[in-house]
Curated annotation (Swiss-Prot):
Residues 26-38 have a biased composition (Basic and acidic residues). Core component of the ESCRT-III complex (endosomal sorting required for transport complex III). ESCRT-III appears to be sequentially assembled as a flat lattice on the endosome membrane. This is ESCRT-III complex subunit did4. Belongs to the SNF7 family. It holds the Pfam family Snf7. GO terms for cellular component: cytoplasm; ESCRT III complex; mitotic spindle pole body attachment site; multivesicular body. Disruption phenotype: Leads to multivesicular bodies sorting defects. It comes from Schizosaccharomyces pombe (strain 972 / ATCC 24843) (Fission yeast). Residues 1-38 are annotated as: Disordered. InterPro entries: Snf7_fam. It comes from the Eukaryota. Residues 15-97 form a coiled coil. Its main location: cytoplasm.
Length: 210
């Protein structure tokens, strides 16, 4: 099923179909906002847990919690990307609604002028009718360009590096990832070298004395 069939299928008018789809998108955006609030609360709790584990010298727990926080932030980022796409689609639908209204008005004016031209047979009215028809074609071409540009924009999706997410939270508690915790994106399940363990333990011991 193409986009046009999805938008304007059924017994409803195009305007009614567009309004219904916009309401559905609005509900989806609100649900994403609620989920983001829950993730924000969980993030704050995880940061406190990481700080507590670091001060207690619990290296293993700090690693696990840092990876959990990394996954949480990745999930939130994907959620925000999804919301951005929903907003872009909603804007596209609104643009289509506006364009549809304008084209309907122009078609109505064109039909009116055509009828007047037939009854009055005035060359000036014929020129005005031709101008309206040209403007109508331009509007349709612009709508096609808007659709193509919006499709290109929806395909863009940036991805953050996982180690940057872990580094950020560990910087907050005074632990340097390059000297302490292993990179969560590449070293999960591996055994760190003894020197790395010693460096991390020393930093955790120092943090616990603060």
């Amino acid at each position: 099923m193409g986009l046009t069939s999805w938008l304007f299928g059924g017994g409803k008018s195009p305007q009614e179909q567009l309004r219904a789809h916009q309401r559905s998108l609005g509900r989806a955006e609100r649900e994403l906002d609620r989920e983001r609030t829950k993730l924000d609360q969980r993030e704050r709790a995880l940061i406190q847990e990481i700080k507590g584990s670091a001060k207690a010298g619990n290296t293993g727990a700090a690693r696990i919690q840092a990876r959990d926080l990394m996954r949480l932030r990745n999930s939130r980022k994907k959620m925000m990307n999804a919301k951005t796409q929903l907003q872009a689609i909603s804007l596209r639908l609104q643009t289509m609604r506006t364009s549809e209204q304008m084209m309907q008005s122009m078609r109505g004016a064109t039909r009116l002028l055509t009828g007047m031209n037939k009854s009055m047979n005035i060359p000036a009215m014929a020129r005005i009718t031709q101008q309206f028809e040209r403007e109508n074609e331009i509007m349709e071409q612009r709508q096609e360009m808007i659709d193509e540009n919006m499709d290109d924009a929806l395909e863009e999706d940036d991805e953050e590096e996982a180690d940057e997410l872990v580094n950020k939270v560990l910087d907050e508690i005074g632990v340097d990832l390059s000297q302490g915790l292993p990179d969560a994106a590449t070293q999960i399940g591996t055994v760190p070298e003894l020197k790395t363990e010693d460096n991390l333990q020393a930093r955790l011991d120092e943090l616990a004395k603060r």
